[in-house]
């Protein structure tokens, strides 16, 4: 039986593109889309490890709070729709995975990242944060 190849229905997310003009700022002082992007990326990475929605949401909220944001998220098996607000403006985004699995080693590293974030992550640049996340 012949099965057609299913092509991914998503586009790559250029996490570093919005950062170009903000390279030297700590992420806590970066514009809303950059701060919200960190929140969403951490959530998507956690979701990709196969962890539950409540755990993803809790971690996203920890990152958001450390960045001075309030975040509301709808989390499915393969996607996250979220909105972050800084009290004046909002930023909404939908992020989707093409597949999911279980990766407890990566999950452990991400949970450590989330726990350390309020202590030292808020002082890192967004570019450095995204580079850290690439290595997890």
Which residues are covered by each model-predicted region?
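Soluble N-terminal domains of membrane-associated systems
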Residues: 1-122
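Acidic, proline/serine/threonine- and glycine-rich low-complexity intrinsically disordered segments
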Residues: 72, 131-132
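Short, conserved catalytic/metal-binding motifs centered on acidic residues
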Residues: 127
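Conserved small/polar residues in nucleotide/adenosyl-binding loops
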Residues: 134-136
């Amino acid at each position: 039986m012949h099965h057609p190849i299913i092509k991914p229905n998503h586009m790559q997310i250029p996490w570093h593109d919005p950062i170009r003009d903000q390279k030297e700022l700590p992420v806590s002082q970066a514009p809303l889309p950059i701060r919200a992007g960190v929140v969403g990326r951490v959530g998507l990475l956690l979701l990709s490890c196969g962890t539950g929605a409540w755990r993803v949401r809790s971690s996203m909220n920890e990152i958001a709070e450390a960045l001075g944001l309030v975040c509301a998220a709808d989390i499915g098996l393969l996607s996250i729709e979220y909105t972050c607000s800084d009290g004046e403006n909002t930023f909404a985004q939908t992020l989707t995975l093409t597949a999911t699995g279980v990766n407890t080693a990566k999950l452990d590293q991400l949970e450590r990242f989330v726990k350390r974030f309020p202590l030292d992550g808020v002082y890192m640049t967004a570019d450095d944060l995204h580079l850290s996340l690439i290595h997890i």
